[in-house]
């Protein structure tokens, strides 16, 4: 079978439709005709709009033609759902189109609600609100301009954890207490019950096993850059959150901090 001929016909079909998304009434994705891992650029002449099914098929054809590991990685990123279920091109297309449409409609409804507008307005204000760092004995350490600054300073921590702490949803984050207000001493965090401690211990054991699995870091072309002994080391290297890297590994996002991540 002449895979190159089939690929060229598929690309020609997409080019004949045009590359103006505003003129198309259905969901499409941008595809690099010559893959970036093979020297392709982001120039408009190297781009074509394809349906999700066509996009998936195009990557399969490229791999069948050239048999490059980097092309295989691109397919791997496309053909697995977040729970590890393998998808064929029809299922992939249906899911991508359905999700895109669903998100678009839900966001339209979201912004119609005055309570949601108020919530987002408050969230934006809190994002730039000063926060105060305390040790576990309640002693004041320092003030940060906002949660983002605190998270960047503590490369092993995460802004989400700090946000949960200042909102009262958790006691500590990164080995510290965090508040929206200043005090010389806020006291020690309240003690947890034995039942809660046991529950957290069981949860941490499971998390630790997953975190000790080697993590592979790739650039966006599929080139292997580094191998980290565990996910925590990977997060520290990019001054990011383990949760964002895990989302990339599980397929919930394609990249995290400018890289592709995988367990193998």
UniProtKB/Swiss-Prot annotation:
The keyword RNA-binding does not apply. Residues 25-50 form the HNH domain. It holds the Pfam family NUMOD1. It comes from the Viruses. InterPro entries: HNH (IPR002711), HNH_nuc (IPR003615), Intron_nuc_1_rpt (IPR003647), NUMOD1 (IPR010896), WH-like_DNA-bd_sf (IPR036388). One of its GO terms (molecular function) is nucleic acid binding. Keywords: Endonuclease, Hydrolase, Nuclease. Gene3D superfamilies: Winged helix-like DNA-binding domain superfamily/Winged helix DNA-binding domain. To phage T4 mobC and mobD. This is Probable mobile endonuclease B. It comes from Enterobacteria phage T4. The gene is mobB.
């Amino acid at each position: 079978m002449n895979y190159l001929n089939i690929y060229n016909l598929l690309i020609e079909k997409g080019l004949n439709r045009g590359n103006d998304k505003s003129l198309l009434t259905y969901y499409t994705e941008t595809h690099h005709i010559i893959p970036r891992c093979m020297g392709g650029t982001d120039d408009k002449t190297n781009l074509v709009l394809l349906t999700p099914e066509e996009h998936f098929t195009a990557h399969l054809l490229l791999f069948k033609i050239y048999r490059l590991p980097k092309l295989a990685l691109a397919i791997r990123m496309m053909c697995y759902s977040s729970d590890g279920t393998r998808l064929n091109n029809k299922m992939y297309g249906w899911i991508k189109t359905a999700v895109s449409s669903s998100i678009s409609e839900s966001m339209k409804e979201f912004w119609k609600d005055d309570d949601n507008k108020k919530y987002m307005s408050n969230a934006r204000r809190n994002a730039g609100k000063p926060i105060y760092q305390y040790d576990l004995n309640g002693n004041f350490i320092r003030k940060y301009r906002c949660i983002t600054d605190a998270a960047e300073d503590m490369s092993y921590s995460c802004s989400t954890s700090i946000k949960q702490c200042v909102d009262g949803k958790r006691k500590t984050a990164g080995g510290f207490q965090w508040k929206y207000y200043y005090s010389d001493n806020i006291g020690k965090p309240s003690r947890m019950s034995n039942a809660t401690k046991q529950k957290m211990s069981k949860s941490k054991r499971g998390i630790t096993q997953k975190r000790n699995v080697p993590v592979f870091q790739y650039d966006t072309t599929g080139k292997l850059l580094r191998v980290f002994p565990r996910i925590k080391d990977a997060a520290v290297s990019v001054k990011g959150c383990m949760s964002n890297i895990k989302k990339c590994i599980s397929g919930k996002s394609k990249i995290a901090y400018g890289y592709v991540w995988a367990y193998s």
